[in-house]
């Protein structure tokens, strides 16, 4: 038997060596195994991230279409880009843990995402504004007060809510597939995934920087403005939430102040000749409408130069510079016209010009067509509805987006509030509200404005207080005896009878006055709105009657405007009252400002200047001859020659030159001419600065800082 041939490669150890081809096969198998493991570990992060990306993007688009009824290509693209890092981080949370935990976290994250977007959708449908993070901290108060109303709106919004709930059902049903078994992603991959999410966020922000076309560009909206509606519309709910948190923490970025502007020269007052009443009206009892001209400006001796020189904080230095360069409002023929009179100032819940009728509401009709008649008055809607409407009207400042401005002002020095001004002049000052005393923290803000404050639960008891809304008439019958015999009085009153919702099931005042509107040719909701506003009519009738009986009517000024338009009506329902389709950008906010005195009976002074609730406080300050600094207030005296500027929450505006629609980024001149883009950009910058520095006044207690330096600050 021939000897066995020994493999030379096997001689040393006597073992058989695996052939080269087998080694290559094993190597390929190992590579496939490693590759498969890599895919599985990355898949643990990618699969839930892709699912959440689809969920958030779908819900964001649904909200845009449901709330705004439009979707631009740019909005769709940027919403996707800014949704991607959010989805990646949530996917990391769900896929970066064990499968058992991930299958619990994925439905939970989906539910939270859907809850936040769904809540914003329903809230916007109710209040025509988006819910702020700050409001969440006060949610117990809101639920306690309007829980039934909220439940009713949720039930009425069953379709969008079901569309928001569907992804959570899918996440629960397919959780095993969406969070698959497999190797752990590992700390390194988790960090790289988070880094990729951050990179996508930075890239998206960089792309926004490139979008600078137009006046109110995407870049300007993202990096400067405080416009929740436009932010949601262009970037999505989650990006709007991020921008809001940034504003709350770091303030609103102003536009660069124009330091070259000099104070405007003293101008002739506008032509405000008394308009003769129609022949069937009673003759005027007084035609003394021309006080002696008193030259000067509404300013206080604030040394801005010293403030600027000594200020180390760049934000405050910028504020000092901007305020110092503002043109002060000149005094005019109407300065001090009402000096020494009493004042009753009413902010009426949901009041509208369209609620008035010479037959149903004769008192409101008379008051709105006599005295000062403002033909182009607007009540813009702000983010915190009634509270922000009050804040704008009573302070002449723009509320800061994302917070309860009136509540936060409670610890600030508010020297220009009429309560504090009149109290310093020896008046008895009161504030009344026929709803819960502490709602929106009014029990803190209103005393700080200089009032003895009464409301339900704090010195005011109403039999109608157990129903909603309570009765404005009953409140007026209770409160007038509290002040009418005072030597001098100044009264601020917030009504509630006109509050939503406008149905017979939910509105006690609509039920009370239903017979008066039952035959009107409108939908039930519109008739319910008109019915509940009739309670305000009766309250005003009672007020005038009690003043006249006490002999105080002739020496009392009555002011009334809305906190906001009745957003409890849909645009379609509001259009019923108008008789045509309402313009939702400007026309829907047009309203009535009543400014009437008993000695102006039968005479009207028509003012066609464009103005808004922002201008009410400085106008009253001028008429009553109060000391204030017009440079430190964002509104202006309507009766002065100051240029008009009506600012809306989305940065649309109306001025003496034309009107700007921020949604279309289009400025239209009144004279039909071609707008100058640089001039329009300067107008938008002015709006931005008024918004930003209103926020600075609130955030820094600016009045105290400035007036302490001038030796004029109070406690």
What would you call each of these model-derived segments?
Residues 2-4, 21-163, 168-210, 715:
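Extended, compositionally biased non-globular segments that define protein topology
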Residues 132-137, 157-170, 243-258, 666-670:
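Juxtamembrane/interfacial segments around transmembrane helices
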Residues 13-14:
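Residue-identity detector for glycine
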Residues 27, 31, 38-39, 51, ...:
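Intrinsic-disorder-associated interaction segments
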Residues 7-10:
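Intrinsic-disorder-associated, low-complexity terminal segments enriched in Asp/Asn/His/Tyr and depleted
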Residues 208-332:
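Membrane-interface segments at or immediately adjacent to transmembrane helices
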Residues 309-715:
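Solvent-exposed soluble domains appended to multi-pass membrane proteins
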């Amino acid at each position: 038997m021939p000897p066995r041939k020994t493999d030379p490669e096997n001689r040393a150890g006597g073992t058989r060596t695996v052939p080269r081809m087998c080694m290559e096969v094993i190597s390929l198998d190992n590579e496939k195994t490693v590759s498969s493991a890599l895919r599985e570990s990355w898949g643990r992060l990618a699969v839930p991230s892709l699912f959440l990306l689809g969920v958030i993007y779908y819900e964001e688009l649904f909200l845009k279409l449901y709330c705004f009824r439009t979707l631009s290509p740019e909005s769709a693209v940027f919403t996707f880009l800014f949704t991607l890092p959010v989805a990646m981080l949530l996917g990391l949370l769900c896929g970066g843990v064990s499968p058992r935990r991930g299958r619990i976290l994925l439905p939970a994250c989906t539910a939270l995402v859907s809850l936040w977007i769904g809540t914003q959708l329903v809230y916007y449908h109710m209040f025509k504004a988006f819910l702020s993070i700050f409001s969440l901290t006060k949610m117990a108060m809101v639920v306690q007060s309007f829980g039934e109303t909220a439940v009713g709106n949720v039930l009425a919004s069953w379709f969008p809510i079901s569309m928001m709930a569907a992804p959570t059902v899918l996440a629960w049903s397919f959780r095993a597939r969406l969070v698959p078994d497999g190797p752990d992603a590992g700390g390194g991959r988790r960090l790289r995934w988070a880094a990729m999410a951050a990179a996508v966020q930075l890239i998206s922000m960089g792309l926004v920087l490139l979008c600078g076309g137009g006046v109110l560009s995407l870049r300007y909206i993202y990096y400067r403005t405080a416009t929740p509606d436009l932010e949601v519309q262009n970037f999505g709910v989650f990006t709007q939430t991020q921008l809001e948190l940034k504003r709350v923490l770091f303030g609103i970025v102003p536009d660069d102040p124009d330091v070259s502007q000099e104070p405007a020269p003293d101008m002739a007052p506008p032509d405000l000749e008394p308009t003769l009443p129609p022949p069937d009206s009673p003759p005027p009892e007084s035609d003394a409408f021309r006080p002696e001209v008193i030259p000067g400006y509404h300013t206080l001796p604030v040394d801005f130069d010293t403030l600027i020189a000594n200020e180390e904080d760049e934000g405050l230095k910028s504020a000092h510079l901007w305020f110092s360069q503002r043109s002060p409002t000149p005094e005019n023929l109407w300065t001090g016209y009402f000096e020494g009179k009493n004042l009753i100032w009413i902010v009426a819940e949901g009041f509208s010009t369209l609620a008035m009728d010479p037959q149903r509401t004769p008192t409101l009709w008379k008051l709105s067509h006599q005295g000062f008649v403002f033909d182009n008055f607007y009540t813009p809607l702000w983010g915190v509805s009634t509270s922000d409407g009050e804040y704008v009207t009573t302070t002449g400042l723009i509320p800061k987006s994302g917070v309860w401005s009136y509540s936060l002002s409670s610890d600030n020095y508010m020297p220009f509030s009429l309560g504090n001004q009149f109290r310093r002049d020896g008046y008895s000052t009161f504030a009344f509200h026929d709803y819960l005393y502490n709602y929106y923290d009014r029990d803190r803000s209103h005393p700080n404005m200089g009032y003895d404050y009464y409301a339900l639960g704090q010195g005011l008891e109403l039999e109608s207080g157990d129903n909603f809304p309570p009765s404005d008439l009953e409140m007026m019958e209770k409160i007038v005896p509290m002040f009418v015999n005072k030597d001098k009085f100044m009264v601020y009153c917030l009504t509630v009878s006109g509050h939503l919702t406008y149905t017979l099931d939910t509105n006690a005042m609509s039920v009370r006055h239903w017979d008066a509107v039952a035959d009107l040719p409108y939908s039930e909701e519109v008739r319910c709105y008109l019915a509940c506003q009739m309670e305000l009519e009766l309250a005003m009738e009672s007020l005038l009657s009690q003043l006249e009986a006490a002999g105080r009517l002739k020496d009392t000024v009555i002011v009334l405007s809305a906190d906001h338009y009745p957003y409890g009506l849909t645009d379609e329902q509001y259009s019923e009252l108008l008789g045509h389709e309402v313009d939702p950008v400007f026309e829907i906010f047009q309203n009535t400002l009543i400014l009437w005195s008993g000695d102006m009976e039968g005479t009207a002074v028509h003012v066609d200047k464009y103005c808004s609730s922002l201008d009410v406080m400085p106008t009253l300050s001028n008429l009553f001859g109060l000391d204030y600094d017009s440079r430190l207030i964002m509104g202006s005296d309507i009766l002065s020659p100051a240029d008009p500027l009506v600012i809306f929450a989305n940065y649309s505006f109306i001025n003496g030159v034309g009107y700007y629609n921020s949604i279309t980024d289009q400025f239209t001149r009144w004279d039909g001419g071609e707008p100058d883009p640089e001039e329009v950009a300067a107008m938008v910058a002015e709006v931005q600065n008024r918004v930003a520095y209103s926020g600075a006044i609130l955030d820094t207690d600016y009045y105290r800082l400035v007036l302490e330096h001038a030796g004029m600050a109070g406690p």
